Amino acid sequence: MATRHGRPRRRTLGLIALLALVVAAGAAAWSLRPQPLLPEAQASLGAKPDTAFKKVGESYEWMPPSMHYSVGLIVYPGARVLPAAYGPLAQRIAAHGYLVVVASMPLNLAVLDIDAANAIMAEHPEVTRWAIAGHSLGGAMAAQYVGTHPGVMRGLALWAAYPPGDISTSGVAATSIFGTLDAGADKMASPDTRRELPPDTVFVPIAGGNHEQMGWYTGQPNDPPATISRDDQQGQVAEATLAMLARVQAQPDQFPAPAPSVGPPASPGPPASPVSPASPVPAASGASSPSGA
């Protein structure tokens, strides 16, 4: 039989449990709240003289006004970062003749929809070559997409990110771009990370750059302040990403490229004539400089 004193105690315990639930829900909501956008992000959501713009669902697309393009870039946002934060960067890239689509993610977490690229590609059959980029968690998930969908993506740009697994044999034209002041910079360029990326991956450290300036948002926790402007860092990110897309355009039609055939050794020919040290040897046409990138 419940005593008169027992009922208030149960009521108090119930109120405490309810309060704990409310606090937990509030903490979860706060932790998932997206980072505030900067005005430049909102201003990018529209057409400009050198780029067209379209919103598809909750994702954003930028492209050249001519609508003539064959290479597309899909961007996965960082955790708790809205797609619009990458609008100014997408505009810079699209102005050079590319389709750039910044994907929207459930709860702004790319880990909840790693295959978001599939629906985007299905919407654009005119694109014949695809690359993928991502910032932070979005970059890790972009790399995971490359690993789990072999032969689909031809290029990968990691913006302040590193792969969660080995994609060294994927054949993609890869670049890793990060600020030297980013708290995770050492991991992004570590020997372990390099081993998990294709051997010809291009690493682009941005002196004085940080994590947050990969986009146009603010409030990134535990991020050291940058010593260069956001616009300067964005320009370097765009340049390095465009270099990756140029490599994608230069790839052969067959992708991944077939492994070189191993045949019987060629029969030895006559010995080569010695070259006099005084005789100049003409350079092969189109040969690259030893100091080339």
Task: Label each region the model flagged.
Residues 170, 176-178:
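Short beta-strand/loop motif that positions the catalytic acidic residue
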Residues 178-232:
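Active-site-adjacent alpha-helix of alpha/beta-hydrolase-fold enzymes
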Residues 133-142:
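Gly/Ala-rich beta-loop-alpha elbow adjacent to hydrolase catalytic centers
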Residues 90-110:
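Conserved alpha/beta-hydrolase
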Residues 13-30:
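Hydrophobic membrane-insertion alpha-helices, especially the h-region
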Residues 69-79:
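Short beta-strand element of the alpha/beta-hydrolase
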Residues 151-163, 173:
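A conserved short beta-strand
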Residues 81-89, 105, 187-188:
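The serine-hydrolase catalytic nucleophile loop
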